[in-house]
Amino acid sequence: MWDNIVLSGFADEIDPSLDEQIRVLKKLGMNHIEMRGVNGKGLVEYTLEEAKEIKKRLDAEGFALSSVGSPIGKIKITDDFEPHMELYKHTVDLAHLMEAKYIRMFSFFMPEGCEDYSPYKDEVMAR
């Protein structure tokens, strides 16, 4: 029954250190991480070159990423989108490098006091 199930979690809530994350997850019998934060900063803050070192460490320990835990969509729907799009593109590149099939994203913050979100639906989907 458990053969096809991948148990994963945010390991940065265990500890900021990748070494400690791996140690604890191994102890729990896990070998997948939904990587959000590693060694004190968000995965999406790393350059591709820096991320290659993280990937090497994960590979050496027999770990894989179930997904990249990103901040994509954690801006106001009314904010300028272009800088966020650049972060999205970088996150996709990181996901490919890390061989993660999935990226966790959000659906944007709606304006304060907004009770009807329907006018923003098309913009959320376009982004």
Model-derived features with residue positions:
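Conserved beta-strand positions in the central sheet of alpha/beta enzyme cores
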Residues: 34, 67-69, 104
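Glycine-rich, proline-tolerant flexible connector loops at the mouths of alpha/beta enzymes
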Residues: 34-59, 107-115
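Alpha-helix-loop-beta-strand connector modules within alpha/beta enzyme cores
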Residues: 48-70, 124-127
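Glycine-/proline-rich flexible loop or hinge segments
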Residues: 36-40, 69-77
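A short, Lys/Arg-enriched amphipathic alpha-helix followed by its capping loop at the start of a domain
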Residues: 2-7, 24-30
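Active-site acidic/histidine proton-transfer and metal-coordination neighborhood
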Residues: 3, 17-23, 60, 77-127
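Short polar catalytic/cofactor-binding loops
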Residues: 11-16
